[in-house]
Each structure stands twice: as C-alpha cells, then as structure tokens.
C-alpha cells in the first residue's frame, strides 16, 4: 500500500510545514518538568500507550514506533485509519514519530507526535499535522472534521500529562 499524499516525510525537519492545499494543525501542550517526566512521556508516545489510553484502537505491526511499521487507528469503533510510520526520533531531549496516511484513511496527510525537553527542563508534547479530507464523510464534515482533529490533538496532551503525573512526583 502506498501513501496517499506528497511530500512524504515533510514533518521530519519542520513540524509547522503545511503544503499547499492542506490544512495545518499544531498543538503544543506542557506535560511537566524533568528527566523522569521526559523519559515517561517518550516511552508512552513511542510504545502506543498514549494513544491506547485515549481509548482509540491501535493495531500495529510492531510494539514500538519504527519506520515502515503499519498502524491502523480505529476511532469510535467504526472509523479505521490506516497509516505507516515514516520517521522516528529518539534523542536525549527529543522523542517521537510521524505517520502518513494510506489508502482507506478518511484523511490524507501526515501527523507527528513529538516529546521534547527544553533547556529549562520543561517537557512538551507537540502534535503537528497537515491534512485534507479524503473520504466523502470527512469532506462532508468540513470545518467540524478539522475541529475534531484539534480536539484529538489537545486530548493527546491531557492524556500524556496524566500518564506522566507519577513520574513528576518521584
């Protein structure tokens, strides 16, 4: 199965990239502070825990995000969204991944989930994407579909902050 959009991998170097004809998404959420919070957040993002804790179905060909891993996200038990991991990053202060849409996904585009620890020790989650409607129901949803994408991105931050709360108190 091939990707349903171009340019594949565009988010790797620039999380704010948005090619012509796509809608941008960029949500940054403060998760906490310190190395323990960063390590916990990175693991939760790389091992699908954040997504599973949100109540979405994750069917992946590997237990951890890695390039070329296929992932199908199921929303509300009904909407299946097949994707493939394009890139991952695991550095001392930055960890995460991005996937691109495959045939059958209601949208086409790319989405990244990146945890970073800034110089002052603050840990952030950035959810960044560029997308446009692919299916008839995503097109019919128009602005409401984009609103749901933003709500999902904000919820990622809330859920990850909750998952990291124990690490913040250690």
Language-model segments: what does each one mean?
Residues 1-76:
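Hydrophobic ligand-binding cavity/cleft-lining segments
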Residues 10, 90, 132:
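Residues that form or immediately flank small-molecule/cofactor binding pockets and catalytic motifs
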Residues 26-28, 70-72, 98, 112-114, ...:
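Beta-strand secondary-structure signal
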Residues 29-31, 73-75, 87, 117, ...:
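Hydrophobic side chains in beta-strands
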Residues 39-50, 104, 120, 158, ...:
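Short, intrinsically disordered, mixed-charge
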Residues 76-120:
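Hydrophobic-ligand binding "helix-grip"
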Residues 102-147:
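Beta-strand/loop substructures that line and gate deep hydrophobic ligand-binding cavities in soluble
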Residues 132-170:
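A conserved amphipathic terminal alpha-helix motif
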